Design a protein with these regions (language model features):
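Charge-dense, helix-prone N-terminal extensions
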Residues: 2-5, 11-13, 53, 58, ...
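Hydrophobic/aromatic beta-strand elements that line small-molecule binding cavities or substrate pockets
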Residues: 20, 52-53, 77-83, 106-113
Length: 156
């Protein structure tokens, strides 16, 4: 079930705020983000693959994800976990390793809340250097959440 997408651009910071309700328990959604083998099944926009994921899921632990677009070269994103609160929340820095001049490190918060037998997923990310970078991430996260939903709901 798709609950909708909300986008927020604060006056001082460019951020994104996305929400989705998935018809599965919160523990299943958290597991999909916490386990590299699961993450590889849905991470990235439609058509992307994640052939390599290094994941040290603890506060201060690092991660590195290789992303492969359908018709392009492999690229990487990496960061550090700032908060690990199973099965409620993950917060981590997010940095492209070969950044565009308009890229900078952002912070992602992936929050999960019970909604009856479903789970409300909230993704917040920011602050972005430009509106164009924020818009790219809104598109990327929207497709990524679509893939997460397809994976999890297909199991039910």
């Amino acid at each position: 079930m798709r609950a909708g997408v909300t986008m927020t651009a604060a006056s001082e910071e460019l951020t994104l705020h996305l929400q989705r309700v998935l018809a599965v328990p919160r523990s299943r959604v958290f597991h999909a983000h916490a386990e590299p083998d699961e993450l590889a099944k849905w991470w990235g926009p439609k058509g992307f693959t994640s052939p390599s994921i290094e994941y040290d899921l603890r506060v201060g632990g690092r991660y590195r994800i290789a992303m492969q677009p359908p018709d392009g070269d492999l690229f990487y994103l990496s960061g550090e976990f700032r908060e690990v609160d199973p099965p409620r929340r993950l917060a981590y820095t997010f940095r492209w390793e070969d950044p565009d001049p308009d890229d900078r490190e952002t912070v992602v918060t992936f929050s999960l809340r019970d909604r009856g037998e479903s789970t409300e997923v909230t993704v917040d990310q920011g602050a972005f250097a430009t509106e164009a970078r924020r818009a790219l991430h809104v598109d990327g996260w929207t497709e990524t959440l679509d893939r997460l939903e397809e994976l999890i709901v297909s199991e039910v």
